[in-house]
Amino acid sequence: MTATEIQKVLPHRYPMLMVDRVLELVSGERILAQKNVTINEEFFQGHFPGNPVMPGVLIVEALAQAGAIALLKMDRFAGKTPYFGGVDKVKFRRMVRPGDTLTLNVTLDKLKDNIGSAHALATVDGEKACSADLLFLIK
């Protein structure tokens, strides 16, 4: 999926759209996506001047958005709005900086009615940057 196709699925827009491309997608099961981190990201103006680091919470948000795409591509959730229901077991292992390509790998674990859980992993050049268990709510 291209950025234009992603915007047809996710309600997020700049500066909060954190997924640039989808490489692999099995609707309702898993997704492999990317976020190209550039120096032009607004958050780098204050985090941190002279030493830019992507805020960890935005890495988790990117993972959640990727997971939301996997859910919203299911026929029963098309056109709905995804909400972040919770996060658990978050671990940050590597700083993400301008020029990095953040690879987002999300596997949906459970789905009951409009609530889903997933395991998520963000990597840069194959190195773990962040892992988390996510909870989604679709309305």
Curated annotation (Swiss-Prot):
What top-level branch of life does the organism fall under? Bacteria
**Does the keyword Lipid biosynthesis belong to this entry?**
yes
Q: Which reaction does it catalyse?
A: a (3R)-hydroxyacyl-[ACP] = a (2E)-enoyl-[ACP] + H2O
List the EC numbers from the record. Answer: 4.2.1.59
GO CC term, one of those recorded: cytoplasm
Annotated coiled-coil segments of the chain = none
Q: Which GO terms describe its molecular function?
A: (3R)-hydroxyacyl-[acyl-carrier-protein] dehydratase activity
Q: Where in the cell is it found?
A: Cytoplasm
InterPro entries, A to Z: FabA_FabZ (IPR013114), FabZ (IPR010084), HotDog_dom_sf (IPR029069)
- Catalytic residues as annotated in Swiss-Prot or TrEMBL: 47
Swiss-Prot/TrEMBL keywords = Cytoplasm, Lipid A biosynthesis, Lipid biosynthesis, Lipid metabolism, Lyase
* Single biological process term from Gene Ontology: lipid A biosynthetic process
Family matches, as Pfam families = FabA
Mainly localized where?
cytoplasm
Record's family?
A: Belongs to the thioester dehydratase family. FabZ subfamily.
HAMAP family in the record, alphabetically? FabZ
Function, in words: Involved in unsaturated fatty acids biosynthesis. Catalyzes the dehydration of short chain beta-hydroxyacyl-ACPs and long chain saturated and unsaturated beta-hydroxyacyl-ACPs.
Q: Which PANTHER family match?
A: 3-HYDROXYACYL-[ACYL-CARRIER-PROTEIN] DEHYDRATASE (PTHR30272:SF1)
In Swiss-Prot or TrEMBL terms, this protein is called: 3-hydroxyacyl-[acyl-carrier-protein] dehydratase FabZ
Task: Tell me which species this is from.
Answer: Oenococcus oeni (strain ATCC BAA-331 / PSU-1)
